[in-house]
Amino acid sequence: MIYGIGIDITNIDRFKTLHNPATFIQKVLTPTEFDEFEAKKGQRAYEFLAGHFSVKESYSKAYGTGLGKKLNFQDIEINYDGVGKPKIVKHPFSGTVHVSISHSDHHVVTQVILEGDN
């Protein structure tokens, strides 16, 4: 049974003009994600940050709470399997989580499907 579906589109370029990037990055990325982010350079770093931001937005929509008091960025962690497929490895949902990320030059679109009962 589908519990929820969340979709988000984010403009990658907006992450290039953050007023306080260090604070924002610490808010959005878990320590494990931050370690991976630090290894990225240039456009790839912006794509990574925008992608993780967007996945967490999509997850919060699928979960039904949005990001805020009940769910925050640190409650959700994304990593990748051996072939680069994204997976959400830390989250409050007890069922199965499906995630997809796609980038263009200027945008990232993500979808999260939560399957099962919570």
Curated annotation (Swiss-Prot):
GO cellular component: cytosol
Keyword Transferase in record: yes
One example GO MF annotation: magnesium ion binding
Primary residence: cytoplasm
Pfam families for this protein: ACPS
Gene Ontology biological process: fatty acid biosynthetic process; lysine biosynthetic process via aminoadipic acid
InterPro entries according to UniProt: 4-PPantetheinyl_Trfase_dom, 4-PPantetheinyl_Trfase_dom_sf, ACPS, P-Pant_transferase_sf, Ppantetheine-prot_Trfase_dom
Subcellular location as annotated: Cytoplasm
UniProt KW keywords: Cytoplasm, Fatty acid biosynthesis, Fatty acid metabolism, Lipid biosynthesis, Lipid metabolism, Magnesium, Metal-binding, Transferase
Family, as annotated: Belongs to the P-Pant transferase superfamily. AcpS family.
Family annotation (PANTHER family): L-AMINOADIPATE-SEMIALDEHYDE DEHYDROGENASE-PHOSPHOPANTETHEINYL TRANSFERASE, PHOSPHOPANTETHEINE TRANSFERASE
Name of the protein in question: Holo-[acyl-carrier-protein] synthase
